[in-house]
Amino acid sequence: MSLNAETKAAIVADYARGEGDTGSPEVQVALLTASINHLQGHFQAHKGDHHSRRGLLRMVSRRRKLLDYLKGKDLARYQDLIKRLGLRR
């Protein structure tokens, strides 16, 4: 249920702040959002898959923590990121 290498590379290229940037909060949140969106279809087909649902909730929690960190660090970057990703915040 993970993303393939080409998809990850495209996301990193779109959200990186510089060359070789894979660890910035923007990149991490974008990758988590793509994984979360990818799992949505799986859960529509497999409603009883509670083991994977726990992993999904971990991803959502990690994304929230990264967004909270970014919001406290740089509000403009935070607002730009949630607008680009289409998150409801």
From Swiss-Prot:
Pfam families with a match to the protein in the record: Ribosomal_S15
Positions of transmembrane segments: none
GO biological processes: translation
SMART domains assigned to the protein according to its UniProt record, in alphabetical order: Ribosomal_S15 (SM01387)
Gene3D superfamilies: 6.10.250.3130, S15/NS1, RNA-binding (1.10.287.10)
GO cellular component terms listed in the entry, alphabetical order: cytosolic small ribosomal subunit
PROSITE patterns, sorted: RIBOSOMAL_S15 (PS00362)
Superkingdom: Bacteria
Gene Ontology MF annotations: rRNA binding; structural constituent of ribosome
UniProt entry keywords in alphabetical sequence: Ribonucleoprotein, Ribosomal protein, RNA-binding, rRNA-binding
Family: Belongs to the universal ribosomal protein uS15 family.
Subunit organization: Part of the 30S ribosomal subunit. Forms a bridge to the 50S subunit in the 70S ribosome, contacting the 23S rRNA.
Function field: One of the primary rRNA binding proteins, it binds directly to 16S rRNA where it helps nucleate assembly of the platform of the 30S subunit by binding and bridging several RNA helices of the 16S rRNA.
Protein name per UniProt: Small ribosomal subunit protein uS15
Lineage: Bacteria, Pseudomonadati, Pseudomonadota, Gammaproteobacteria, Vibrionales
